[in-house]
Curated annotation (Swiss-Prot):
CDD domains: PurL_repeat1 (cd02203), PurL_repeat2 (cd02204). The lineage of its organism: Bacteria, Bacillati, Bacillota, Bacilli, Bacillales. This is Phosphoribosylformylglycinamidine synthase subunit PurL. Its EC number is 6.3.5.3. The keyword Transmembrane does not apply.
Length: 742
């Protein structure tokens, strides 16, 4: 497209062309006031992407301020490529989760693949070596051909990119609900290890220092991707396929190694991934954070396609690109590092003292904008919020009481639900053992990755039960954080901090904004109670299809530290004769439960309650017992209740079964999703020591007969199922649904 074909500044205003880029009339007037003139086409595009929700968080910023972000171990909180937490011995862990929802709905393979690529770059831009990937996925019901296609392609995209770049995908979660039918959620998390002295930041400082472009050449892919991510999906979204980028994991691997070598050089001042809004966001954000300006000559930008305009170059979201600021005179040193990996590092500009983003093209100024107007001074909106009518209706409902006649069939039915069923079909496509540091592979409560050369490991998990959040966003927000911590504790780790990905509908709707506010309130309270500050994150709003929003889904990514490899614990029972305990009492809480969804085909009523003091106390007790060496296995009780938790504990163990006795209301005891509960197994010789450390109730013991037997108080058999039968149902559910032709 030639510059001559671009609309003039006057046309942009008169024909309100800025609206097509996502700017409102008020925002355009504000831009006019900032510049003291009408913006040209390139400048309008730059403002549009930088002021999109995706880049500016203009609708969510006031809510995000509620999160606790400080803690004794926090080295870098929100605002950089990734959060960083100290893990002792001069080492730290860098991690972040991000969404790639809209691109994955349109082009699922590349959408998911480039989501993985982007989050890896965020982590190594901090100077950290990525050691693990996780993902949190949401789809509609697996009975629909389109959902099957999206599911298969998203998983293939994640596997294709992660496996090629050589970083193990060690964990995550997949849930299926009709609310995600048209708008799947694809959240990717990356975790890296870094020495304290290698920590880098995305800043541009030092007048005269050189701005260098490294990595892949710029093409026309992904233009306005950030704006696309800030609007609802509709029938017309399919036409926006060009806004989805294409990834090259082999280029990423070279870029990763070159950048990690460059960060060790004193020549490097700052480094940032060209992510959403590409060259625009990386340059404007680095300059604004550093308190300087940047001038770039766009004729020098490496281009993949002929005749690209400043607008296209600045808004392209071509993958595998980084922007560096290098000390003046040291350009050759940095270029030599990248050349070693077959990559070009090209000087395209310099740091200035006037706090302006100035773009030159063919000898003329193509754009000139104050950097702070694009970054820290972007508009912030305080949206109205209103309690939804459905919430009041759910709160007023009497407690839901399920009726069960056949407990065996109920347990088998729950094990076949895709949200509970084995995700082996998914993680078998991931190389989760590459780099050989994975100690606990996918399928347990949390993945565990050891830190090479040390007697320490990291426990990693992603969690969020969005059904609870739909019923009650504040309670559901607390539960999301608490469950992540439970999973980390069950692995023998102390929870350190979280990263979050807030996936919600349109903030323009007061009921949706209320969900966001309440969820963040609940998460913040739980983070304070459990001592896990928020160190990084991402907001993804406008997750709607034809006006229907997804469930509120604030995914929590948590990292915990195992300070001695002997403390690593898994959920599978270990040997016959071990005693089985339950921590926590069951109440009749079935709102939003797997049982309610299976029996009624929908969810309603009140979410389970949670007492954060009780939660914190039980977690402390269990971790102390694990560290004392008196716990053989630990598993949190979540979807499907105690019955499903027991099944999972025996299905992971070869040839073992369990025999337990349950009193009280059997439906509640077995299937309620009451919070803050665990199933533990303990060797007989550790019984006394365990009971002194933990308040728990002994319910039975591990057997060697390969059968799960649950008896009532009167000795009657309530459940008797062979572990093989349960395992076949549990493992076969997802492959069976994918093969069925409906």
């Amino acid at each position: 497209m030639s510059l001559l074909l671009e609309p003039s500044a006057a046309m942009i205003k008169e024909q309100k062309l800025y609206r097509e880029m996502g700017l409102t009339d008020e925002e355009f007037a504000r831009i006019e006031a900032i510049l003291g003139r009408l913006p040209n086409y390139t400048e309008t595009g730059i403002f549009a992407v930088m002021w999109s929700e995706h880049c500016s968080y203009k609708n969510s910023k006031p809510v995000l301020k509620k999160f606790p972000t400080d803690g004794p171990h926090v080295l870098q909180g929100p605002g950089e490529g990734a959060g960083i937490v100290d893990i002792g011995d001069g080492l730290a862990v860098a991690f972040k989760i991000e969404s790639h929802n809209h691109p994955s709905a349109i082009e699922p393979y590349q959408g998911a693949a480039t989501g993985v690529g982007g989050i890896i770059r965020d982590v190594f831009s901090m100077g950290a070596r990525p050691i693990a990937l996780l993902n949190s996925l949401r789809f509609g019901e697996l009975t629909s051909p389109r959902v099957k296609y999206l599911f298969e392609q998203v998983v293939a995209g994640i596997a294709g990119y992660g496996n090629c770049v050589g970083i193990p995908t060690v964990g995550g979660e997949v849930q299926f609900d009709p609310a995600y039918e048209g708008n799947p959620l694809v959240n990717a998390m990356c975790v890296g290890i870094i020495r304290h002295e290698d920590i880098q930041r995305g800043v541009a400082t030092g007048v005269g220092n050189t701005v260098m472009y490294v990595g892949a050449k710029t093409g026309r892919d992904g233009i306005h991707g950030a704006t696309f991510a800030s609007e609802e999906l509709s029938e017309q979204s399919e036409a926006k396929r060009p806004a989805v980028q294409v990834g090259d994991p082999f280029m990423e691997k070279l870029l990763l190694e070159a950048c990690l070598e460059a960060v060790k050089s004193d020549a490097l001042v700052g480094i940032q991934d060209m992510g959403a809004a590409g060259l625009t966001s990386s340059s404007a954000e680095m300059a604004s954070k550093g308190g300087f300006g940047i001038e770039m000559n766009l004729d020098l930008v490496p281009q993949r396609e002929a005749g690209m305009t400043p607008y296209e170059m600045m808004l392209s979201e071509s993958q595998e690109r980084m922007l560096l600021v290098v000390k003046q005179g040291c350009e050759d040193e940095i270029a030599a590092i990248f050349a070693k990996y077959g990559l070009e590092a090209k000087a395209i500009g310099k740091v200035t003292d006037d706090k302006m983003l100035r773009l030159l093209f063919r000898g003329e100024v193509a754009a000139e904008i104050p950097v702070d107007a694009l970054a820290k001074d972007a508009p912030v909106y305080h949206k109205p919020s209103a309690e939804p009518a459905y919430y009041r209706e759910f709160q007023a409902m009497p407690p839901y009481t399920p009726h069960i006649e056949d407990y065996n069939q109920t347990l088998l039915g729950l094990l076949a639900q895709p949200t509970i069923a084995s995700k082996e079909w998914v993680y078998d496509q991931y190389d989760y053992m590459v780099r050989t540091n994975t100690v606990v592979a996918p399928g347990s409560d949390a993945a565990v990755v050891r830190i090479r050369g040390m007697n320490k490991a990291l426990a990693l998990t992603t969690d969020c039960n969005s059904r609870y959040l739909y019923l009650d966003p504040e309670t559901g927000g607390k539960i999301a954080v608490a469950e992540a911590a439970r999973n980390v504790i069950c692995s023998g780790a102390k929870p350190l901090a979280i990263t979050d990905c807030l996936n919600f509908g349109s903030p323009e709707k007061p009921e949706i904004f209320w969900q966001l506010e309440k969820a963040v309130d609940g998460m913040s309270e739980a983070c304070r109670a459990l001592g896990t500050p928020v160190v990084s994150g991402n907001v993804s709003l406008y997750n709607e299809t034809n006006g229907e929003a997804v469930y509120p889904t604030p995914v929590v990514g948590m990292v915990g530290l195992i300070d001695d490899l002997s403390h690593i614990t898994t959920q599978s029972f270990k040997q016959a004769g071990d005693l089985i305990y339950v921590i926590g009492e069951a109440k009749p809480e079935f709102g939003g439960s797997e049982l309610q969804k299976w029996l009624e085909g929908r969810i309603f009523g009140k979410a389970p309650e949670i007492d954060l003091e009780v939660e914190a106390s039980r977690q402390r007790q269990l971790l102390a017992a694990i560290r004392a060496g008196v716990v053989a296995s630990a598993h949190d009780i979540a979807e499907g209740g105690l019955a499903v938790a027991l099944a999972e504990c025996v299905m992971g163990a070869s040839g073992l079964g369990a025999k337990v006795t349950i009193g009280g209301d059997l439906v509640s005891e077995l299937f309620s999703e009451t919070q803050s509960r665990f199933v533990i197994s303990v060797k007989k010789e550790h019984q006394e020591a365990f009971e002194q450390l933990v308040e728990a109730k002994r319910i039975g013991e591990v057997t060697g007969d390969g059968i799960l037997t649950v008896n009532g108080e009167q000795g009657e058999t309530v459940i008797r199922l062979s572990v093989d039968e349960m395992r076949n149902v549990w493992k076969g559910a997802i492959p069976c649904l994918l093969k069925s032709k409906d």
